[in-house]
């Protein structure tokens, strides 16, 4: 690794590359800016103002832009009374290397095996390593969309994880054993559930202490309030805070060591404001519904920030394409080799690039310097690409392809330059490493060999095609036919039925793969309409009651292997007094199937339920078309 004390002096190559006289960036800057800094140059005049930002000459304005934005940064920090104390803490410094983060649904079958009834963290992590190089942290998600189905609040849902808190604690330890940090969620919007009469910061901190978590993700927060940090400090536990949104107040940067954010979409990649203000702050880009993540990865690589590799989105599977997975693997490999460079306070975006729509950022130290390069063109670029100041004895490496470079050197002394030739795939990436004379870089040869092995297969040779995951309904064995309705059942007559339903998922789009797939459909979709010729069937007149379920248990001795919360409303193995005819609750799907099999019945399909309730006249509610 590179020595830790990198930045005690000014960067040795903070010089202007010889060129034509640079333009002055004189756009007035307000005290506050949005998530991205303004681009380095003047916006083109009408009619190109909205469609022609690619015309901005970033090379010509870059030096002046960096100068003006450095002044703005200095003054802005003075105005807010900025303190970097939290970034100097050794016990939370890992956040500065938390490059690949994911949100994981606890229902994910790679995380938990319901048959074996055990957490399978190794299986989950091994799959991610195989597909895109693995993760540095995970957000264990046990709340939405299930919250609200009963009175349990966000903390109580964690207590009800398989194995309870001890089971969750072991899962956390299993992640940490593999070098993966663990975040827990907190929801400001959880207001209609059981009130524990304690503030959210106290509830989630106590939970983090109990299971040994490393951080807290603030769902829907644009900055986790300072009360969370003060509560954690009071409990003597170091927690990293990570709001879902970009910080609404720059002052919150002082204790929110991480944040999620979105990428800019301009051809010229924008600089992320928070990263510019505090280079040690880890931004993890999030774009959960993306099917092509190239723009995300280029913005990420240019800014030296991280990514949220979220695929299981509320139970809807949005898997990385092969190309996206391989791209993230290569970026993360470079990041994990040179984490100290990516937090350099002397970061310089918009290094001089000689190819149109190719952009680079410089992350320097006294020992070595990394340039991250992105090709925004939809075609391959090859030739002289990057012009940088040169120091005598410096060696250059193509860190993306794993080979040493022989740049074209010109000038001497302070005017010396190196012109570097690169070959960049269309919409591709590059990385240049400059190592000063006799500078120590541990196992550089091994790293270069690893990158060469990865680069042996170009990114464009991996499939970029996104495909929805197919869904198949598990067949249910038919029950024994009955000519007339058994006791307690009614006959639903045969008929033609327009089955119409629309998904309630609040996010996402109307793509293939979104929501649910019925047996007659070729792919999952949000909206469904299908005419079904229904056969007659018998249907229970009333929901299964507590008394009915008690008869089943008495007759069979049924008891589930996992009995947590099983028949939670019962007392001493029986329904409460007066509850015999109430619908039975706190039974699982497996419990319901076991009861139905004992009763000689089966659970209804969704379209059978809807047909029984809606009838043949298409009414919206069982009683008619108007809400009563």
Language-model segments: residues:
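Catalytic domains of carbohydrate-active enzymes, especially glycoside hydrolases
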Residues: 123-143, 210-213
């Amino acid at each position: 690794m590179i020595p830790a004390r990198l930045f005690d002096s000014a960067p040795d190559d903070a010089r202007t590359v010889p060129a034509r006289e640079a333009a002055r960036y004189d756009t007035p800057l307000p005290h506050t800016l949005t998530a991205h800094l303004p681009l380095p140059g003047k916006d083109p005049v009408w009619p190109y103002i909205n469609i022609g930002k690619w015309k901005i000459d970033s090379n010509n304005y870059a030096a002046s832009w960096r100068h003006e934005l450095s002044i703005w940064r200095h003054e802005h920090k003075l105005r807010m009374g900025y303190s970097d104390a939290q970034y100097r803490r050794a016990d939370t410094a890992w956040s500065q290397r938390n490059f690949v983060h994911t949100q994981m649904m606890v229902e994910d079958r790679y995380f938990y095996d319901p048959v074996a009834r055990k957490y399978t963290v190794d299986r989950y992590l091994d799959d991610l390593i195989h597909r895109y190089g693995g993760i540095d942290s995970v957000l264990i998600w046990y709340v939405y969309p299930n919250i609200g189905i009963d009175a349990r609040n966000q903390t109580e849902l964690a207590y009800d994880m398989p194995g309870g808190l001890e089971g969750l604690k072991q899962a956390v330890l299993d992640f940490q054993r593999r070098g993966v940090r663990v975040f827990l969620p907190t929801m400001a919007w959880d207001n209609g559930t059981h009130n524990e009469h304690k503030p959210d910061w106290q509830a989630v901190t106590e939970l983090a202490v109990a299971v040994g978590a490393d951080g807290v993700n603030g769902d829907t927060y644009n900055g986790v309030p300072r009360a969370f940090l003060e509560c954690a400090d009071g409990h003597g536990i170091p927690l990293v805070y990570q709001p879902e949104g970009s910080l609404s107040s720059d002052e919150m940067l002082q204790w929110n060591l991480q944040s999620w954010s979105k990428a800019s979409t301009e051809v010229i990649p924008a600089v992320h404001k928070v990263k510019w203000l505090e280079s040690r702050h880890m931004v993890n880009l999030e774009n959960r519904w993306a099917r092509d993540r190239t723009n995300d990865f280029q913005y990420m690589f240019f800014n030296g920030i991280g990514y949220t590799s979220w695929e299981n989105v509320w139970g809807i599977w949005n898997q990385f394409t092969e190309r996206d997975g391989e791209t993230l693997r290569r970026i993360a490999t470079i990041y994990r080799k040179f984490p100290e460079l990516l937090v350099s306070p002397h970061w310089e975006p918009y290094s001089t690039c000689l190819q149109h729509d190719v952009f680079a950022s410089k992350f320097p130290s006294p020992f070595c310097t990394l340039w991250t390069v992105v090709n925004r063109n939809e075609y391959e670029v090859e030739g002289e690409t990057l012009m940088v100041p040169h120091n005598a004895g410096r060696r250059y490496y193509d860190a993306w392809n794993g080979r040493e470079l022989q740049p074209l050197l010109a000038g001497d002394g302070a005017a010396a330059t190196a012109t570097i030739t690169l070959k960049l795939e269309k919409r591709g990436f590059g990385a240049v490493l400059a190592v000063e004379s006799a500078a120590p870089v541990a196992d550089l040869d091994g790293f270069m060999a690893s990158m060469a092995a990865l680069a042996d297969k170009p990114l464009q040779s991996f499939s970029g095609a996104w495909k929805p995951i197919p869904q198949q309904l598990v067949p249910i064995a038919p029950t024994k036919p009955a000519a007339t309705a058994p006791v307690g059942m009614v006959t639903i007559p045969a008929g033609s039925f327009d089955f119409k339903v629309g998904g309630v998922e609040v996010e996402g789009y109307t793509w293939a793969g979104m929501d649910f797939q019925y047996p007659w459909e070729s792919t999952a979709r949000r909206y469904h309409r299908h005419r079904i010729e229904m056969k007659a069937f018998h249907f229970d007149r009333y929901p299964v009651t507590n008394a009915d379920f008690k008869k089943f248990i008495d007759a069979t001795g049924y008891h589930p292997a996992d009995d947590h919360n099983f028949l939670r409303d019962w007392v001493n193995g029986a329904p409460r007094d007066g509850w015999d005819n109430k619908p039975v609750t706190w039974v699982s799907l497996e419990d319901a199937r076991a009861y139905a099999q004992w009763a000689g019945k089966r659970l209804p399909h969704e379209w059978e339920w809807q047909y029984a309730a809606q009838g043949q006249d298409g009414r919206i509610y069982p009683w008619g078309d108007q809400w009563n």
